[in-house]
Amino acid sequence: MSRSIKKPPFCAPHVLRLVNKAIAQNKLNSIINIHSRSSVILNKFIGLTFGVYNGKTYVPVKVNDNMVGRKFGEFSPTRRYTGHVGDKKVSRK
C-alpha cells in the first residue's frame, strides 16, 4: 500500500537539519553522513552528496534530479553478492 496523498514525504528531521546547515555554510561539496535510509530524497537535496550508511561503511551518493522521490537506501546496497562458486568436481580423462 502506498503512502497517503494527504501526508508529506517522510524525511528525518536530523537529515533536514544537516542539509540546511550545509546550505547555510555553503558546504555543497562536502559529504553529509546519514544513517536514515528510509528518508525520501527531496528537491532541495539536488546537487548535494550524502554518505548513506549500509551497516559497515558510508556509501557516497550524489543526488541528481532523477533520484527525487526515492529513498536513500535504494542507492546503498547492504549485501554483497560474491557470485556462485565454481564446480568442484575433478575432471577425469
Curated annotation (Swiss-Prot):
Q: Which InterPro entries match?
A: Ribosomal_uS19, Ribosomal_uS19_bac-type, Ribosomal_uS19_CS, Ribosomal_uS19_SF
Q: Which UniProt keywords apply?
A: Ribonucleoprotein, Ribosomal protein, RNA-binding, rRNA-binding
Gene Ontology CC: one annotated term: small ribosomal subunit
Q: Which Pfam families match?
A: Ribosomal_S19
- Superkingdom per UniProt: Bacteria
A Gene Ontology biological process annotation?
translation
Kindly give the PROSITE patterns that the UniProt entry links to this protein. Answer: RIBOSOMAL_S19
UniProt GO molecular function: rRNA binding; structural constituent of ribosome
State the PANTHER family in the record: RIBOSOMAL PROTEIN S19P FAMILY MEMBER, SMALL RIBOSOMAL SUBUNIT PROTEIN US19M
Q: Which family does it belong to?
A: Belongs to the universal ribosomal protein uS19 family.
- Role this protein plays: Protein S19 forms a complex with S13 that binds strongly to the 16S ribosomal RNA.
In Swiss-Prot or TrEMBL terms, this protein is called: Small ribosomal subunit protein uS19
